[in-house]
Amino acid sequence: MKIIKRNGAEVPFDITKIITAVTKASDSVGGQSRLTREQITQIAAAVTDQCQALNRAVSVEEVQDLVENQLMDIQAHDVARHYITYRYVQSLKRQTNTTDERILSLIECQNEEVKQENANKNPTVNSVQRDYMAGEISKDLTARLLLDPEIVKAHQEGLIHFHDSDYFAQHMHNCDLVNLEDMLQNGTVISGTYIEKPHSFSTACNIATQIIAQVASNQYGGQSISLTHLAPFVDVSRKKIAAEVEAEMEGLDVTPERKKEIVERRLRNEINRGVQTIQYQVVTLMTTNGQAPFITVFMYLGEARNAQEKADLAIIIEETIRQRYQGVKNEAGVWITPAFPKLIYVLEEDNIRPGTPYYYLTELAAKCTAKRMVPDYISEKKMLELKVDKNGEGHCYTCMGCRSFLTPYVDPETGKPKYYGRFNQGVVTINLVDVALSSKGNFEKFWKIFDERLALCHRALQARHKRLLGTPSDAAPILWQYGALARLKKGEKIDKLLFGGYSTISLGYAGLYECVKYMTGKSHTDAGAKPFALSVMQHMNDKCTEWKKAENMDYSLYGTPLESTTYKFAKCLQKRFGIVPGITDKNYITNSYHVHVSEPIDAFTKLKFESEFQKLSPGGAISYVEVPNMQDNLEAVMSVLQFIYDNIMYAELNTKSDYCQCCGYDGEIKIVEDDGKLVWECPKCGNRDQNKLNVARRTCGYIGTQFWNQGRTQEIKDRVLHL
C-alpha cells in the first residue's frame, strides 16, 4: 500500500508513523487521558484497514483525518485536541512557503499527482516541468489571493471544480475555433513577422502549423481548424504547377491530357507533403504549455463554397485519413497511434450511403477509426436540428478542441452566422454526486442543495469572466490583433467579445449516473429513474438561461470530461461520505451524462439513450461506444456510423492501439494490480516500463498516450464492450 506525501511523492505506507504521531499526542496529556500502548496500536491498525479498503494510494491528510475520527470514536478527546492542534501548527508553518516542496518534488520527478495529471504531458521533460512550476505558482496565487475563499474551499472539498487554476493568474481564455481562413487569406503576424497570403498549398499548411503553435501558447484549452480553409490553396498550387509544366513542355509533343496527368500527380505529391507537415509538426511541436497543441482538425465537405473547392477538399480529407491510418513511428521505428491532431469527420447526405459521391471517404474513415480511434463523427442531420440560430436556421460546425460547442450566433454587423474566431471563457463543474449524498436521499433537500451549489458555480464563473474583463489585445496579439479570434487595435480591450453571445462560458457537470443511482436506487437508463435524470439536466439548463438573460453572456451547459479530476472527486467523496456501495466505492465518477462504464448495454441502445441527454448539453458533450478490434469487421463499423448519422449529433468509437517495445507485442496492454496500485503490463513479456510501452486509450474525447492517474486507470479497466 502506498501513501502520497504533501509534496506529491508516493512512498510505502508505514504504520509506525501513525503510532509515533498518536503516541506523541497521548504523551502531551496527563493522567487518565493518556492512551495505552494497546489502544494506540488498535487505532493505527483500524486506520490501516480503512486505507486498505480504499484500494488506492491515500494522502497524508486523509490518514490524519482517519486518525482524528478514531480518537473521537473512543472518546479520547484530550488526545484528539492535542493531535489536531499539532496538525494546525504544522499547517501554519507550511503556509509560510506554500509551493517549495511541491515544486522541488516535481523537478526531481517524485510528484506522483503531477506525473499522472495529464495523459498528454511527460513530466520528466524540462519544458513540461517549467509549465508545471508556473502552474504551481498560479494555483497558489489563485487559492490565496485571486479567488473568493468560499469558492476555494468548495473546490478543495470537491463540491465543485474550478478548472485550470494553474493558468488563472494570467488573463487567458479556454478554447476556440481558429479563424484560419481570415489569417491565410488576409495575412497575419507571427512573432513580429508579417506573413502574407501563401502562394501554394504546402506553404499554407506550414503557416497553419505555426498558427496552431502560437495559438496554443496563448490559451490553456483546445483549438480547432477546418481543412476547408486550406482547400482554396489546392487550386492555387494546381495553377502554379500547370504553369511550370507548360514551361517545361514548351516545344515538346505532349498532349493536353498528358500534361494534366503530370500536373495532378505533382499536385497530389504536394498535398501529401502538406498534410504530412501538419501531422508531424503537430505531434513534434512543443508549446509554452509543455505539450503538443491540443488541436482538432475538422473535415466537412458541406463547408465548401463551390464544386472545385469541394473536390479539392475531398482530396485533402482522403490524404489526411490515409496518413492517420498509417500512424507515426515510435522510437523503435514501429507505426503507432498518435494522440494529435484529433480528427472530426462530418456524416452527411453526400457520404453516408452506398452510391453517394463521397461514400468512399466514409469507408476510409471507418477503416481508420477501427485502427486508430479517429476520426470522431458529427451528424450533419442531427446538428442542423439542434444548433438553430435566432433566424431559425440550423448550422453544422466543429467543437472547440475536444467537445466544447459554441452556441448559434448571428453577427449583428453582417447579419450572417459566425463560428470561426469565437471562443470559450472558461469552465466550472458541479459535482452532482456530492449534491445527492449531501441530501441523504431527501428530494426536497436535494433541490435546495443543488441550487446552493449552482449559485456557487455561478459566482466562480463570474470570477472567470472578470479575470478576462479589461484584458488588452496586446496580451496575445496572435489571438486578438492578427486574426485568430479578432482584429482588434493595439491596446484595445477584448471586453466586447465577452458579451452578447460572441463567446461562451460553461457550467460543467459530472456524475449524473451516481447522482441518480443514489437518489432513486436505479441507473438513469432505468425507465423509473430517467425522468429524474432529465429533470436534473433541465434544471441546469434553466439556470444557464436565467444567468444569460441577466448578464448578456452565453452561459451553456457542458458535459465535463474529467480527465484527472474524476480521481480527485472520488477521493473527496470518500473522505466526506465514506464508502457508499455503488456510489463511492470506485476511484472515479462517471463523466457527464454517460452510462456507467461497467453497465452492460449494446452500442445502439447506448447511443440512442444518450442522445436525449446530449441534446440537453448544448455547451458540449460527446458519446462513445467501446468496441473490440473491428479491423476485420468494417461492415459493423459502417452500421454504427449510419446509426450515429440518424440518431446522435456527436459520437466516437473507442478501441485499443498498443505496442510493447520490449517484445513487439501489438495486442492489448493489460492493467494489473500490484500492492494496491494499478499498473500497465505487457501480457506477453511482462514489461511494465511505461517508457517502453506505447498505450493509446480514449481519455475524454482526446486520445491519451502518457498514461493516467489511478482513478482514470480504474475507469479504463472497468469499461465493458458495447459491440
Regions found by a protein language model. Name each.
Residues 271-275, 279, 517-518, 712-718:
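Metallocofactor- and cofactor-centric catalytic cores in central/energy metabolism, strongly enriched
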Residues 299, 505-518, 538, 698:
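Contiguous, well-ordered alpha-helical segments that form the cores/surfaces of helical PPI scaffolds
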Residues 1-110, 717-722:
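Charged, amphipathic alpha-helical regulatory modules used
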Residues 23, 458, 462, 513-517:
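Amphipathic, well-packed alpha-helical segments that form the structural scaffold of globular domains
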Residues 14, 677, 699-702:
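Conformational switch/transducer regions in large eukaryotic molecular machines and scaffolds
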Residues 686-723:
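Long insertion/accessory domains within large nucleic-acid-processing enzymes
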Residues 89-501, 522, 526-688, 694:
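Conserved catalytic cores of very large enzyme subunits
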